[in-house]
Amino acid sequence: MADKVAVLDPEPITLLDTEDEPGISQSRRSSIANSNFYIERAFVTNCTIISGERSTPKFAVWKVTAVLHPLNPNSSGSYRIHTYKRYSDFVEFRNALLDRVRTKRPASVSEIPELPPPVKWYYSWKYNEINLNKEWLANRRKGLELFINQVLLNGNIVDIAKDLVIQFLRPRK
């Protein structure tokens, strides 16, 4: 690849527990980014197909956007964190979440959502045909967006794995 994409790292965020703070609704408590912002939701968009090198097949890269809003009602505007992830990044993130939750709070394992399914092994001979199909990609995008929102807006998961959430939202270098 001759052209490289330069990515500017977002300003670091800190997820805080504000359970005892009055005036913050329960739905917002689970998505606090720092003392000034909360994560309202995330979007998975802009699927870009990348040609792998030599024997590596083509793969999809998804744009993940987390929307931050100020906690202060007098403040206006919102901020967005953008990062780009492959399906395999979501798989690694989910596996890391499962490992963390199993050790810290085993009863919460069921709160970690499933990811959309990968290409079935018996279709591996036509992997590119299936994995790059527009309908397949549209369904995968919906599943990834559902997954990331269920994770980011779940206070139990964020409380247990703040560092993993922040690491996932950081762009690769």
From Swiss-Prot:
What is the top-level taxon of the source organism? Eukaryota
The similarity comment for this entry is: Belongs to the YPT35 family.
The record's annotation in SUPFAM superfamilies points to: PX domain (SSF64268)
Q: Where in the cell is it found?
A: Endosome membrane; Vacuole membrane
Q: Which UniProt keywords apply?
A: Endosome, Membrane, Vacuole
Q: Name one GO molecular function term.
A: phosphatidylinositol-3-phosphate binding
What function does the entry list?
Answer: Recruits the lipid transfer protein VPS13 to endosomal and vacuolar membranes.
The PX domain extends over 40-173
Q: Which InterPro entries match?
A: PX_dom, PX_dom_sf, Ypt35_PX
Q: How does it sit in the membrane?
A: Peripheral membrane protein
Know the name of this protein? Endosomal/vacuolar adapter protein YPT35
Q: Let me see what the UniProt entry remarks about domains.
A: The PX domain binds phosphatidylinositol 3-phosphate (PtdIns(3)P) which is necessary for peripheral membrane localization.
One Gene Ontology cellular component annotation held by this UniProt entry: endosome membrane
> Record keywords: Secreted included?
no
Q: Name one GO biological process term.
A: protein localization to membrane
